[in-house]
Design a protein with these regions (language model features):
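N-terminal beta-propeller domains
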Residues: 1-112, 172-257, 335-384, 416
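Hydrophobic or amphipathic alpha-helical targeting/insertion segments
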Residues: 127-162, 167-169, 173-176, 182-185
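Leucine-centric amphipathic alpha-helical interface motifs
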Residues: 6, 127-129, 405-406, 477-526
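Exposed low-complexity, polar/acidic, P/S/T/G-rich flexible segments that act as propeptides
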Residues: 425-461, 523-525, 531-554
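Beta-strand initiation motifs
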Residues: 107-112, 155-158, 202-211, 262-271, ...
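Repeated scaffold domains used in trafficking and secretory/extracellular systems
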Residues: 72-83, 119-132, 166-178, 227-231, ...
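Short, surface-exposed beta-strand/strand-loop-strand elements in extracellular ectodomains
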Residues: 465-473
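Beta-sheet-dominated scaffold domains
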Residues: 232-428
């Protein structure tokens, strides 16, 4: 007679578990022993999305502006977008210490070597401005040598006291902003704000028939300093949108005005003065919706949060979770400045912000090593997912400038022009990504664990996944990531040969899952460290499955 086998009650020796990819992004703030598993300690070249980590896309060469006969020509340091009301005539200008070069965003264009507008400095600011008489790209440098200029879609016009229309202080303008149908100007080493007549693109300051007006701000700023940036802020106060003009100082103070006509006291007034961390440079500001986002020496800042808050709180800064990494990047800028005899804000001119709305991506581009003659320096990027507020870091992108032009992002390095987030290689080179999860306790706090089997889950479309994986125990990295190995994925379906309903067709996202054994030091706290190398394929990390054996407390 058969009898049921009685359960001995023995505790299972191995337990399964699943870990999702750290989609909440990089975390350099929380204690290692108390960090949630949805965060990563290292996240290089992975972009955190809502449900996975995407291997960042690459860039493709669009045009070379490299002259083999003049190898010491200066690199590009700015990309300026000309975006007229009609699509016709839109273009990009790459700027170096030689001047402006017009770039065509049509793929595979011939090399471009012509200087459209000569200059001796590449650090320019610009604004697009339409006044009925044309669509203008208004540019200024403010170095005391290079004159302000405008581009109308066909030609450049230098603005100075002898031009038509005339402009005073042409070589001294360091920033320009469009607000309430006027152009507002900041003068080099000055705390005086200037503005032009409505719809005017130039003006002169004189006793009679003045067309260039001034508004002193020095008495409002108790920290001193000069104007570094002018931006407009749009907020909804509950009764409709309100527009404000925000004037930022080099010392970290902001004068905010509201109104339509600065020449009429009844239609113009000071809203308040606000203290913020010092901006890195005039090049480190960007509009995001109606808000102003800026890179400061203490982190990334959304000015609307300061504007609507009585006291400054560190937690409202978007970069609080990577605060220490941000400070290290700023300290690196200070070191570069010390070596070159430059201030932090002068070195900060080589840093920048770029918003890529289609990918919910905000790129904070940091100079990491100063250039030598004819070469772009080394750069790193801290990147924010603007939807989830998750951070990551991009590496191996030594781009001196990024810009969003007609919903695509372009970048420059040395004298080469690229389209970013295009394809799955870095100009035909491998893209390598590294991730390290937060430390976790598979068997509970205080109990030793041994991972006997592990299965990473990837989604990919074309090729096998090359990866390397190690396990770090008890907050120590005792193993190094080796050359990535290949994980096989399901074969692609071939017409007339594949089995219908079973095979995966080309372009279909496929799941890569392979159990593998892994050797590691037994410990209570476990972290997974992964390296992926890819060339020509889209890869997303979904998570990991683990088989764990539990041990004792010692």
């Amino acid at each position: 007679m058969r009898r049921q086998v009685m359960n001995s009650g023995a505790r299972p020796t191995a337990t399964p578990s699943t870990i999702i990819a750290p989609i909440s992004g990089l975390n350099i703030r929380d204690p290692l022993a108390n960090m949630q598993s949805r965060y990563a300690l290292v996240l290089d070249n992975f972009f955190p999305r809502a449900s996975d980590l995407q291997l960042r896309k690459g860039y493709v060469l669009y045009s070379s502006c490299y002259d083999i006969d003049k190898k010491d020509r200066p690199p590009f340091v700015r990309l300026l977008s000309y975006a007229p009301a009609t699509y016709k005539g839109n273009c990009l200008f790459a700027v170096s210490d030689e001047g402006f070069i017009k770039l065509d965003t049509n793929k595979n264009t011939a090399p471009v070597l012509k200087i459209d507008s000569p200059a001796t400095n590449g650090l320019w600011q610009s604004v697009n401005f339409s006044n009925g008489g044309g669509d203008w790209l208004w540019c200024c440098c403010g170095d005391g040598v290079n004159k302000a200029r405008v581009y109308d879609g066909t030609k450049w016009t230098i603005l100075d006291s002898a031009s038509t229309p005339a402009l005073d202080y042409s070589t001294e303008w360091v920033d320009v902003c469009s607000f309430k149908r006027r152009l507002w100007l900041a003068r080099r080493n000055s705390d005086v704000l200037y503005y032009l007549d409505v719809l005017a693109i130039a003006g002169v300051e004189k006793k009679e028939n003045t067309t260039l007006y001034s508004l002193p701000l020095g008495s409002l700023w108790n920290r001193g300093g000069s104007i570094i940036k002018i931006m407009n802020l749009t907020l909804d106060s509950g009764s409709g949108a309100d527009d404000y003009l925000c004037i930022f100082s080099t010392e970290g103070q902001v004068a905010v005005y509201k109104g339509n006509n600065p020449n009429n006291d009844n239609d113009w007034g000071l809203v308040g003065i606000y203290d913020i961390p010092k901006p890195l440079s005039a090049n480190c500001f960007i509009k995001y919706g109606g808000d102003i986002i800026l890179m400061t020496e203490n982190g990334l800042l959304a000015f609307s949060e300061m504007f609507q808050t009585i006291e400054i709180k560190h937690s409202i800064m978007s970069s609080a979770i990577i605060h220490n990494a941000w400070l290290e990047a700023v300290d690196r800028l200070r070191l570069i400045g010390k070596e070159k005899g430059l201030t932090l804000q002068q070195v900060g001119q080589y840093c920048s912000l770029c918003l890529y709305g289609e990918q919910n991506m905000l790129i904070c581009n940091f100079l990491h090593d100063f250039r030598s003659d004819g070469e772009t320096g080394a750069y790193i990027q801290y990147v924010l997912n603007t939807e989830s507020r998750a951070w990551c870091r991009f590496k191996d992108l030594h781009m001196s400038a990024f810009t969003n032009h007609r919903d695509s992002v372009y970048c420059v390095a040395d004298r080469y022009f690229y389209k970013f987030w295009e394809g799955y290689t870095d100009n035909k080179n491998f893209i390598t990504a590294i991730m390290k999860t937060a430390y976790m306790f598979p068997s509970g706090r205080g109990t030793n664990s041994r991972i006997t089997l592990i299965r990473p889950t990837f989604q990919t479309q074309i090729l096998d996944v090359k990866y390397s994986l190690v396990i770090d125990s008890d907050y120590k990295e005792l193993q190094r990531l080796r050359t990535p190995r290949t994980m096989a994925v399901s074969p692609l379906g071939i017409w007339d040969e594949a089995i219908w309903d079973d095979a995966f067709w080309v372009g279909t996202p496929r799941v890569s899952q392979d159990w593998t054994t892994i050797n590691h030091y037994i410990g209570k706290a476990i972290s997974l460290r992964l390296k992926v190398a890819a060339k020509g394929q889209d890869i997303a990390l979904v998570g990991f499955d683990l088989i764990t054996q539990s041990g004792g407390m010692i």
